[in-house]
């Protein structure tokens, strides 16, 4: 039997409702007959494994929930192909997804991993429209690795907040997005895979950082390799994810001692200004604090006027809430996770 060209791993935890859609999308891939599809059921209690088996794909079941990083490790270690590709159960790959993604790895021995674009589903709620306009699932650009210093990261934050212009076209990046990424299996073996202490949030960034800084090779972004992500339409879920990403940022900082912390300054400034206004009884300070998001994220009100979309005037505050929840997650992990990432300890 001919070995598959790639193994597609879908990790699930109680994903029975969403899983059929992604499996159907994988069944319509232009390269379908060259693929192995593997579902890793990470301790679900809703019949996820039975749903996967009904679609005729390989299934591996964790008896207990071990986290996304552990599920991904199970997936690539069980792959029968030289390349392993990851997507999620709430994603819908385009029919030519892998036809466009795989050549980035296969045609260049210096490329050890590749990722494609992850876009939000058609906007039918305020939250989804915001996430479509302010996509949280973008690759980390290569300029992030130019320096680990705090000043460099602060400059990147201000620059991207004021004028968030994203590069276009295929290019090298410092990290790809977990919902749309592919690696050589041999490369993952050398790196010992994902660090399972990350559980969820930051695990792919940690892996990519280790790979790139080790000199193993380059990571390539292929924007035409498209996956649609069905974001949960509620603001509550968006903020929950932001908090989880903040915990991942803290794990990155605890593990990589040379890395500056990823903390968003604007929520801290707004809270400090509001506290000072209340303490000193300066109501004008409170007004100024509430206008800070409109000034720093000035592209939102500008676009609201130019494009006649008044709803976008709310977006600076949604972004403020996201960044604030990320900071809360960061602080919580810094308080509780130090023992887990003791100095010199490896995964």
Residue ranges and their predicted role:
Residues 14-28:
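Short, well-formed alpha-helical segments that are part of the catalytic scaffolds
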Residues 25, 32, 41-49, 64, ...:
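A conserved acidic beta->alpha catalytic loop
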Residues 49-78:
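Conserved donor nucleotide-binding strand/loop of the catalytic core
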Residues 84:
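Short aromatic/hydrophobic "clamp" motif used to bind/position activated sugar donors
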Residues 134-173:
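Short, flexible, basic/aromatic active-site loop/helix in glycosyltransferases
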Residues 219-334:
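Active-site-adjacent helix/loop segment of glycosyltransferases
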């Amino acid at each position: 039997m001919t070995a598959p060209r790639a193994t597609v791993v879908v990790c699930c935890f109680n994903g029975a409702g969403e899983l059929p859609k992604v499996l159907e999308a994988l069944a319509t891939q232009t390269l379908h007959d060259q693929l192995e599809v593997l579902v890793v059921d990470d301790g679900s209690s809703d019949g996820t494994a039975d749903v996967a088996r009904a679609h005729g794909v390989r299934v591996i079941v964790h008896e207990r929930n071990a986290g996304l990083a552990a599920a991904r490790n199970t997936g690539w270690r069980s792959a029968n192909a030289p390349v392993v590709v990851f997507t999620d159960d709430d994603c819908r790959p385009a029919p030519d997804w892998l036809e466009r993604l795989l050549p980035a790895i296969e045609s260049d021995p210096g490329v050890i991993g590749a990722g494609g674009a992850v876009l939000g589903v058609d906007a039918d709620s305020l939250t989804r429209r915001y996430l479509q306009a302010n996509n949280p699932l973008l690759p980390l650009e290569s300029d992030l690795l130019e320096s680990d210093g705090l000043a460099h990261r602060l400059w990147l934050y201000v620059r991207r907040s004021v004028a968030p212009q994203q590069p276009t076209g295929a290019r090298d990046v410092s990290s790809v997005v977990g919902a749309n990424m592919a690696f050589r299996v041999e490369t993952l073996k050398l790196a010992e895979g994902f660090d399972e202490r990350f559980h969820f949030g930051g695990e792919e960034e940690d892996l990519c950082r280790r790979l790139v800084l080790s000199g193993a090779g380059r990571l390539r972004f292929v924007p035409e390799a498209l996956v649609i992500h069905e974001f949960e339409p509620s603001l509550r879920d968006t903020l929950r994810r932001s908090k989880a990403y903040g915990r991942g940022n803290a794990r990155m900082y605890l593990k990589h001692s040379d890395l500056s912390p990823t903390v968003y300054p604007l929520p801290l400034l707004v809270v400090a200004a509001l506290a000072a206004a209340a303490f000193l009884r300066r109501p004008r300070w409170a007004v100024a604090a509430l206008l800070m998001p409109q000034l720093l994220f000035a592209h939102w009100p500008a676009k609201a006027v130019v494009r006649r979309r008044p709803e976008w005037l709310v977006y600076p505050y949604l972004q403020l809430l996201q960044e604030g929840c990320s900071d809360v997650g960061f602080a919580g992990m810094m308080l509780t996770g130090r023992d887990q990432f003791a100095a010199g300890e490896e995964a």
